[in-house]
Amino acid sequence: MAIDTFAKKDFNTIAIMGLGVTASAIMNMLSYTLKDKNINIKLLKYKDQAESFVKKYEKNEQFSFEICDTHEELIVDSDVVISTVTYTDEYLSEFKWFKKGALLLPVHVMGFGNVDYLFDKVYLDDYNHLKHLENIDRYKYSCEFYDVLSKQAKGRENDDERIISYNIGLSIHDILFANKIYELCETLSCEEIELKEPKEKYWI
């Protein structure tokens, strides 16, 4: 959804660093949501992960693949940059590597504290979960993703804006809880469930 909402028009290059389970889940999603687009996928080389990743998706003709040796090579000229690196205590980029119009999606929120405040807009899926970010008070323009979806705030306004969308995956929890509520409705044969603050663990 972040790509659909914040990527520039006619984007055609997606860069991915960190090629584990999360990256595979993203590729599966892109295979469905971008099925009418031809996309060049750039992968950061690490051990044999990039080659294995290509083999996994090479039958999908909408994707072409390019393996990059450095972070700079990966990011330069990419329209969308996705980081699924699970842990790092180092910065992963320089601001000058991001082209005009680039969208950066740091899935695990790490590695871009040296550049995020230089982007034109920074979107957060939940402020309280991300208020620890080192530059949270320095962003030029920032709001929650929801505010854009509900048209209470501006999204991308032109194809030159560099944008970051920090997502920590709260929607996954929302979907789980909604599913549990539906299950309760079926089990209890009721149309309404009283929602109140939980005092014990209902679902394990």
Regions found by a protein language model. Give the residues of each.
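Glycine-rich adenosine-cofactor-binding loop
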Residues: I3, A7-S31, L44-Q49
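Adenosine-phosphate binding glycine-rich loop
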Residues: I3, V115-I204
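A general structural motif
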Residues: D10-F11, D36-N40, G101, F119, ...
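Beta-strand segments within the central parallel beta-sheet cores of soluble alpha/beta enzyme folds
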Residues: I14-M17, N40-L43, E192-K196
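A short acidic, amphipathic alpha-helical/loop segment
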Residues: M29, S93-W97, F177
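NAD(P)-binding Rossmann-fold cofactor-contacting core
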Residues: Y32-E58
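A short helix-to-beta-strand connector/capping loop
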Residues: K37-I39, N60-E66, D159-D160
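Rossmann-like adenosine-cofactor binding region
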Residues: F63-D137
